[in-house]
């Protein structure tokens, strides 16, 4: 209770619910509005002694941005410096349900290789194209500070929330499909189709390098009102 967490905006809105339900506060640091990459000047300014954790989502929901190795290295260096200055670890929670849904050639950086105090959250539901079927894991790297205690805390948190075991059927599915993915070419085709159409109609939209979202700029200041009007055309949009 009372701890602060940072994340990059725009972000998956349930992050705020997760943090606040545990008595913490979530501060969103706006990304660079042109490419949605981390604005390191703003991020460093927000990284106060109250911050105990950072939530990172790459590939990102909702922008589709992917953070490069250079970005992860820079973030790791900053968190290492601030952890030493403040006298406590700043945990990096790397939320990676879209890890396999990428449209670039180079592999995604494995975050624990750059920053020891990283917790990796993964879900099979996206890579297998089974959204809604919640099965995955939280990885606590052995090199993390007090790794055994943190591992026990993660297990205890799941039990406290009522999640003792994943559904038995999907435990078998995950085991049988290890190393497999759905056809990623379908996602790329849909991305290109929608992105090209939006740009032809005059919308500004950064090209997603991962996940299955588009985050176009609304043609008017009130994004919420724009999304409400879109419902008349059976379009479900989320303002950001």
Task: Indicate residue ranges for each PLM-predicted region.
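PLP-dependent class I/II
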Residues: 1-240
């Amino acid at each position: 209770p009372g701890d602060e967490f940072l994340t990059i905006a725009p972000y998956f809105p349930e992050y705020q619910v997760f943090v606040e339900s545990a008595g913490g506060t979530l501060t969103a640091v706006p990304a660079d509005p042109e490419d949605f990459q981390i604005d390191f000047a703003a991020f460093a300014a927000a990284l106060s002694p109250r911050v105990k954790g950072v939530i990172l989502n790459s590939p990102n929901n909702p922008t589709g941005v992917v953070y490069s190795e250079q970005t992860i290295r820079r973030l790791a260096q900053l968190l290492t410096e601030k952890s030493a200055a403040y006298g406590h670890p700043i945990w990096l929670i790397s939320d990676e349900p879209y890890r396999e849904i990428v449209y670039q050639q180079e592999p995604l950086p494995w975050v624990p290789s750059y920053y020891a105090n990283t917790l990796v959250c993964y879900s099979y539901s996206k890579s297998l194209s089974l959204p809604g079927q919640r099965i995955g894991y939280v990885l606590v790297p052995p090199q993390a500070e007090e790794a055994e205690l943190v591992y026990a805390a993660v297990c205890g948190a799941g039990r406290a929330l009522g999640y003792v075991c994943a559904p038995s059927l999907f435990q078998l599915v995950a085991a049988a499909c290890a190393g497999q993915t759905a056809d990623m070419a379908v996602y790329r085709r849909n991305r290109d189709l929608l992105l090209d159409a939006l740009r032809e109609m005059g919308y500004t939209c950064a090209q997603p390098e991962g996940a299955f979202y588009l985050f176009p700029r609304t043609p008017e200041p009130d994004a919420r009102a724009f999304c409400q009007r879109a419902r008349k055309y059976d379009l479900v949009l989320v303002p950001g």
